[in-house]
Amino acid sequence: MDESALLDLLECPVCLERLDASAKVLPCQHTFCKRCLLGIVGSRNELRCPECRTLVGSGVEQLPSNILLVRLLDGIKQRPWKPGPVGGSGTNGTSALRAQSSAVVTCSPKDGPSSQGGPQPRAQAWSPPVRGIPQLPCAKALYNYEGKEPGDLKFSKGDIIVLRRQVDENWYHGEVGGVHGFFPTNFVQIIKPLPQPPPQCKALYDFEVKDKEADKDCLPFAKDDVLTVIRRVDENWAEGMLADKIGIFPISYVEFNSAAKQLIEWDQPPGPGVAAGEGALATTPSSTTTKQPDGKKNTKKRHSFTSLSMASKASQAAQQRHSMEISPPVLISSSNPAAAARIGELAGLSCSAPSQVHISTTGLIVTPPPSSPVTTGPSFTFPAEAPYPAALATLNPPLPPPPLQAATPTGTAVAAAAGMGPRPTAGPTDQTTHPRPQPRPSVYVAIYPYTPRKEDELELRKGEMFLVFERCQDGWFKGTSMHTSKIGVFPGNYVAPVTRAVTSASQGKVPMLTTGPASRGGVLANPPSTGGPAQKPPGNGVAGGPGVPTAVVSAAHVQTSPQAKVLLHASGQMTVNQARSAARTVSAHSQERPTAAVTPIQVQSTPGQSHHPLVSPQPPAPLGPPAHAAASGLGRVGGPLACATAPASIPAASLEPEPSSRPATLLPGTPTSPDSGSAARPDKDGKKEKKGLLKLLSGASTKRKPRGSPPASPTLDAELGAELSCGPPGPPCACPGPCDGDTMAPGPQRRASSLDSAPVAPPPRQPCSSLGPAASEVRPAVCERHRVVVSYPPQSEAELELKEGDIVFVHKKREDGWFKGTLQRNGKTGLFPGSFVENI
């Protein structure tokens, strides 16, 4: 090992400068340069080891020197250095390099190494090319190079060339005798490589700490600050330096350059944790070892700007090698409970990204997103001639979010069954600890249009596909458009995951017919191969069994649900109710339950529970009114669940309960027969009604625009428009046809009488318009008194302004967590998030 390679190892871990005899060793046996230790004492009024955070009681001057370091430095100065054909005997490395560089000016290139070697390192300090710099990056010419183009650097064999910068892996820009120019890499042998860019990172958000005493080890910074990365602390935290301050910071708040990625990768804790970079970055040969000539002519053009590392983008030029080479960061579940709690505390962090707090059905919470490692996977393009489901068959579904603590007592069984489908089954420990990293970025489709309001935001067009690299804590996604290739952030509740639609009879999925009259009416039927008495439920066609408890549905993470698979049309067009259902599908930890014969969502149950697809031998039923209040029939504890059938035009609807963690049971429906629909209308009338409803729904969805920042769920506006188009505001709409899994037979039918026996009467239902074939019985309105626990400023005219302590009479609880009620203070009626009130 020569002197230069050894000195590269003897560097201060903080400032990365080479250590000298003045370096001090701490009681923990870590060695740092004296300048860094004095800077730490001056900024923090105490001395802690930057490596292990051990408190040092004595001052910097009282610390001992590193004896081993002093002996190594003395041995390097006294031992003759014999690097080969370049150096001369009796010289140390510094004087040899000075002699070789000054030979360009003082003597001929060939006798430079022998005539300029001297024992005193300062004898050649007058040479212009190396004045004031002990060592310059340089290379020795192996062959003569005459240059082929203007701007090329001409040199002869044996010349010492001062390296200025590296254009790419094949070309350098250097200087010989004051003449600058380009020359090929394989014509020279690198003696002293160019310095690597320092490991740095750029802040994406503000990172502040309110309790400075409790979080004194944290390093606060503002957005766009550039930090020097020191090391990785654990899976989710790194240590860095900003100005003269040293501390730890969350990895997910910054973006690393290539050098920092290598440092983070090397310091990765052992175990199956996710790496913070895109993998180990391969450096160029000239930056690590002496480059040997390949013996072949260079065929690559010098300005091709080929990548300096395996994971860098091909469009990055080498002139910008000292700039920030940014790649999407990674959100990793921390193995340190204190670090994870520090990230999750709502009052502890302030983030400059939009909407740090999102509203879920359980209140104001901050939930960490699942791990989303950034990989350099291939770009996903969908050929125009390929069918839509076939193009999606190769894509992996997104990871499930960690289960909320407000889940039902059967959350363990729910988590155990969350792995059904094409993925391997995940046990309860997988759901509560760290999810497995997905092998490639997730693919999402925009279900609502979104106009960007900041420079780093992406414009969303309905039906547009996106590759999501990162799911931020505030509910925003970072990804790239598969149509425009632009990279930016966008609200996560405006997109839905695109998952593979693989059906299997053993998994109990409900198939959906996309052609023929059955799909026109929205009736679902089993394939002939899966029919038979063994798979047909008795009575009303709903899989029997006791009440299936349901879990809380978090509205902020519906887009990461791998279980609620919504089958999208190839045309990309969706009705309002369909888009609402797609945006509010149940997350991974929620228990799937048997529903009416309108849902194509994968049905799965706990072990031992019978589960069957639904069979409907009848012809399609006429279109009913919008069933956007399907969850309003969910009773309280012990109450039955009344499922409303969705419109026939909706191919993918999700019948969800109201946001509550209380269990619900299914109503035992009344057996039906093909003769039960005696008041059926002709199919032609059904088509007309369907077209009319589509016009109403599409008009309601296009007239409304998303609200201002932070973007709330666009389904609120869409549903409000649908309510206004159906009739005056009031009790929720009810399905005129049979529910609870009954076949869609036309005609006026009443629900099961057990609905009246519920301990608490469900909200009343009434028909939305005259489109339905019949009207169900109107029940008197039941209002519930709620008290406002957190003030809420309205985001639109349809919302109520809530002040803490106000009394609100709730008329309706919607499935997306929003309530409709009347404020006692001023008598106004409107919408408000249910997590801001409590029942009294």
From Swiss-Prot:
Region (Disordered): 105-129, 267-324, 394-442, 516-545, 578-633, 652-723, 744-773
Residue ranges covered by zinc fingers (RING-type): 12-53
Biased composition (Low complexity): 273-282, 307-320, 405-424
Residue ranges, compositional bias (Basic and acidic residues): 681-692
BP GO annotations: negative regulation of apoptotic process; neuron migration; positive regulation of JNK cascade; positive regulation of proteasomal ubiquitin-dependent protein catabolic process; protein autoubiquitination; protein ubiquitination; regulation of CD4-positive, alpha-beta T cell differentiation; regulation of CD8-positive, alpha-beta T cell proliferation
Protein's UniProt keywords contain Phosphoprotein: yes
EC number: 2.3.2.27
Leader sequence segment: none
Entry GO terms, CC: cytosol; Golgi apparatus; lamellipodium; perinuclear region of cytoplasm
PTM (free text): Phosphorylated at Ser-304 by AKT1 and AKT2. When phosphorylated, it has reduced ability to bind Rac. Autoubiquitinated. Ubiquitinated by SH3RF2, leading to proteasome-mediated degradation.
Keywords associated with the record: Cell projection, Cytoplasm, Golgi apparatus, Metal-binding, Phosphoprotein, Repeat, SH3 domain, Transferase, Ubl conjugation, Ubl conjugation pathway, Zinc, Zinc-finger
A molecular-function term among this protein's GO annotations: MAP-kinase scaffold activity
Phosphoserine PTM sites in chain numbering: S304, S709
Regions of compositional bias (Polar residues) in chain numbering: 283-292
Chief location of this protein within or outside the cell: cytoplasm
Catalytic activity: S-ubiquitinyl-[E2 ubiquitin-conjugating enzyme]-L-cysteine + [acceptor protein]-L-lysine = [E2 ubiquitin-conjugating enzyme]-L-cysteine + N(6)-ubiquitinyl-[acceptor protein]-L-lysine
Role noted for this protein: Has E3 ubiquitin-protein ligase activity. In the absence of an external substrate, it can catalyze self-ubiquitination. Stimulates ubiquitination of potassium channel KCNJ1, enhancing it's dynamin-dependent and clathrin-independent endocytosis. Acts as a scaffold protein that coordinates with MAPK8IP1/JIP1 in organizing different components of the JNK pathway, including RAC1 or RAC2, MAP3K11/MLK3 or MAP3K7/TAK1, MAP2K7/MKK7, MAPK8/JNK1 and/or MAPK9/JNK2 into a functional multiprotein complex to ensure the effective activation of the JNK signaling pathway.
Stored PANTHER family: ENDOPHILIN-A, SH3 DOMAIN-CONTAINING
Domains as described in the record: The RING finger domain is required for ubiquitin ligase activity and autoubiquitination.
Quaternary structure and partners: Interacts with RAC1; in a GTP-dependent manner. Interacts with MAP3K10/MLK2 and MAP3K11/MLK3. Interacts with MAPK8IP; this interaction leads to the PJAC complex (POSH-JIP or SH3RF1/MAPK8IP apoptotic complex) with a 1:1 ratio. Interacts with SIAH1. Interacts with HERP1. Probably part of a signaling complex that may contain SH3RF1, MAPK8IP, DLK1, MAP2K4/MKK4, MAP2K7/MKK7, MAPK8/JNK1, MAPK9/JNK2, AKT1 and AKT2. Found in a complex with RAC2, MAP3K7/TAK1, MAP2K7/MKK7, MAPK8IP1/JIP1, MAPK8/JNK1 and MAPK9/JNK2. Found in a complex with RAC1, MAP3K11/MLK3, MAP2K7/MKK7, MAPK8IP1/JIP1 and MAPK8/JNK1.
Name recorded for this polypeptide: E3 ubiquitin-protein ligase SH3RF1
Organism listed in the record: Bos taurus
Gene name as annotated: SH3RF1
